[in-house]
Amino acid sequence: DKGGVVYRLDPVTLEVTQAIHNDLKPFGATIDNATQTLWFGNTVNSTVTAIDAKTSEVKGRLVLDDRKRSDTVKPLQPRQLVADDTTNTVYITGIGKESVIWVVDGATLKLKDTITNTGTFSTGLALDAKAKRLYTTNADGELVTIDTATNKILSRKKVQDDGKEHFYLNLSLDTAGQRAFVTDSKQPEVLVVNLKDGSVMQKIAAPASLAV
């Protein structure tokens, strides 16, 4: 397929029940359960695509960085996506040497805001919608906390200042326990981090980890 394909799987058997073809290659994905909208980041095109989960029809598309790639210009690329079902908002990491997070209105498919200064290759993204907190991780070894009410960075914490190389690629939240599970593609471990102060609560031995 010159573009890409999104597969719908049976949650019990994992059999493919549907194939949604798209002219652009999808990478990151999320779903807004309230609107039944699938959101896909088209990394190589710096674009996000919205698809109706019921009909599989494309609802719309938004170019997030329209700069033309050259030897000196490298458009930011969408990586991870999370949807806030309570506000119909989609957050998308735009990775590069100076990364951003795009804030997209799910109803209009328009860019509402751009959160800048999220670090080098800030790939990881997780949302605590109830607390209005968005978290991202980056290749600078940081955990960055953002207030979704204002789209402002509240804090940035260097998780481990141990002289080793760290690239915190992804994270997943335990909102009840106020913990983040953070993968490190440079070290053989997954970190359990306290979201209140950014301290490391535990290290779980694992091969150089990517997703969590």
Briefly describe each language-model feature range.
Residues 1-212:
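Predominantly soluble domains enriched in secretory-pathway, periplasmic, or organellar proteins
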